[in-house]
C-alpha cells in the first residue's frame, strides 16, 4: 500500500534533514526503477552535460540533483538551488546575475547573483517551467553566450557553471502552448532523468 511506504519514507527524510545529510531518500536505494536512475546518474555525473530531471512533486528531484553534483568533478564547488516558482520577471535579472550599487532604487550595495555564487559548481533550477517567458529569454542568452551582465554594470562576466533543471510538468506540451521556449528546453535537456511517482515505487 502507498500508505505503508509513505510513513517510513517521511520519517527517513525528516531524519536525514535533521542530520544535515544530503543523501538520496531510503526509497530511492531500493527497487529496479531507482536502480535505473542510479545507472543514468553514473552515466552523466562526470560530464558537463546539462540534465533535466522530470518527476512529480515530492519524488526527490533535488536529491537527485545533489547526487549528480556529489558524483561530479565539480563536487567541491558550490551547489546553488533556485526556486524558479518564487522568481518574478522583475526580480529575476538581479537574482540570477546580481547588481551593482545604485543600479535601481533600494540597491544600496552590490549583490552577487546565482551565477556568481555557483561559479565552478552547479546551478539547480527547480521547477524551471515556472519561469516567465522574459526570464527564459534572459537565461537562454546567458547560456548561449556563456556570459552575463549584472544589473547596472557596464561589463559582461563569463561563467563556468553546470546547469541542472527539474520540472513536474510536460515541457513539450508547454512549448506547444507557448509557455516555454523550445530553444531553452534544447539547451537544458542534453540528458534526461525521469523519476517515477511514489505510487509506482
Language model features with spans:
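N-terminal accessory segments that target, anchor, or regulate ATP-driven/P-loop NTPase machines
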Residues: 1-22
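Conserved two-component signaling phosphotransfer/partner-docking surface
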Residues: 1-7, 93, 137, 181, ...
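Coiled-coil segment of the histidine kinase dimerization/signal-transmission module
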Residues: 16-19, 142, 148, 187-191
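AAA+ ATPase active-site-proximal loops
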Residues: 21-158, 163-169, 174, 197-200
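Short, solvent-exposed amphipathic alpha-helical segments in soluble enzyme
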Residues: 69, 179-181
